[in-house]
């Protein structure tokens, strides 16, 4: 509940802050003097609705979509020792992290990987790949599970949604302002919106969206260090380091699907600025430094 309240409070605070900034600097008056009749408050509300709607809906259906896209087999009735061990381990770690028992699942994938998702820490899903179970020792798997449990306990899914929603709001808002200014000032359109508004708005939204995604990925990399530290506190630092080293040995395995990469423990080899995960060497180094 606290995170939801923070989510709503931040959304409102962002809208109020932008309104104050534009009022203090007389931005709307400046636009009016140049023939740009733009209701910034209405546009801001519109942008927030558009910006947060997709993020919130994605969060609420994240478990359903993860199960569907990865074809996750949820362990409701464990059929073998491995499945029973997985359930016991996650249950113990969830108690240590003071969260509700997540659903536990297995998905078929050659890459040793795992992910956690869900709209709150008491309604989450933790899933591991068959490649993880086949290529790691129990202590290493335990460390990976602890890493994912830490993501849930830290509320990373909600925080990512909050950040994405705020950035989406800025992207939609600024792209519309830029399009409107170009339409009125450069092309002298006096009523409605001409083609320039839509073209410039779309181009601006793409460019600003790319910049926003870099910020989201920066935070995602930061949260991986936190989850590693949390995993180490639950499963032991040496086990966490060993698990990351094992992942490093398997970096050439097939990567996770793009839509799930940000939730996995390892995202494979991607460009640094757009990577959801820090390099494994840096994560290992951070754990070794304590």
From Swiss-Prot:
Sites where the protein binds Zn(2+): 147, 151, 224
Any one GO molecular function term: metalloendopeptidase activity
Annotated disulfide bonds: none
Keyword ATP-binding: no
InterPro entries assigned: HtpX_protease, Pept_M48_protease_HtpX, Peptidase_M48
Cell compartment(s), UniProt: Cell inner membrane
A GO CC term assigned to this protein in UniProt: plasma membrane
Keyword hit for Electron transport: no
Pfam families reported in the protein's UniProt record: Peptidase_M48
Cofactor info, note text: Binds 1 zinc ion per subunit.
Membrane topology field: Multi-pass membrane protein
TM region(s), chain numbering: 12-32, 42-62, 162-182, 197-217
Main location: membrane
Domain of life: Bacteria
Positions of the catalytic residues: 148
Enzyme Commission number, as recorded: 3.4.24.-
Cofactor: Zn(2+)
Family matches, as PANTHER family: PROTEASE HTPX
Family listed: Belongs to the peptidase M48B family.
Name of the protein in question: Protease HtpX
Primary gene name: htpX
């Amino acid at each position: 509940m606290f995170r939801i309240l923070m989510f709503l409070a931040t959304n409102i605070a962002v809208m109020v802050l932008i309104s104050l900034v534009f009022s203090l600097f007389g931005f709307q008056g400046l636009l009016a003097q140049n023939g740009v009749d733009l209701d910034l408050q209405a546009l801001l509300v519109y942008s927030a609705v558009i910006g947060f709607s997709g993020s919130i809906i994605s969060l609420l259906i994240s478990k359903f979509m993860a199960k569907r896209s990865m074809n996750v087999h949820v362990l409701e009735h464990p059929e073998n020792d491995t499945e029973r061990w997985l359930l016991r381990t996650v249950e113990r770690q969830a108690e240590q992290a003071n969260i509700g028992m997540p659903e536990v699942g297995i998905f078929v994938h050659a890459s040793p990987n795992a992910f956690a998702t869900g709209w709150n820490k008491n309604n989450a899903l933790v899933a591991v790949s068959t490649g993880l179970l086949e290529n790691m020792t129990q202590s290493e798997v335990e460390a990976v599970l602890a890493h994912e449990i830490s993501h849930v306990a830290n509320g990373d899914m909600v925080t990512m949604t909050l950040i994405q929603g705020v950035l989406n709001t800025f992207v939609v808002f600024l792209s519309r302002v830029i399009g409107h200014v170009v339409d009125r000032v450069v092309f002298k359109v006096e009523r409605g919106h001409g083609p320039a508004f839509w073209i410039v708005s779309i181009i601006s939204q793409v460019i600003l969206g790319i910049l926003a995604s870099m910020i989201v990925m920066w935070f995602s990399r930061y949260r991986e260090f936190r989850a590693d530290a949390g995993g180490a506190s639950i499963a032991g630092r040496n086990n966490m380091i060993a698990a990351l080293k094992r992942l490093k040995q398997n970096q050439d395995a097939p990567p996770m699907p793009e839509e799930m990469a940000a939730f996995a423990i390892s995202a494979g080899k991607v460009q640094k600025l757009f990577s959801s995960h820090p390099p494994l060497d840096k994560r290992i180094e951070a754990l070794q430094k304590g």
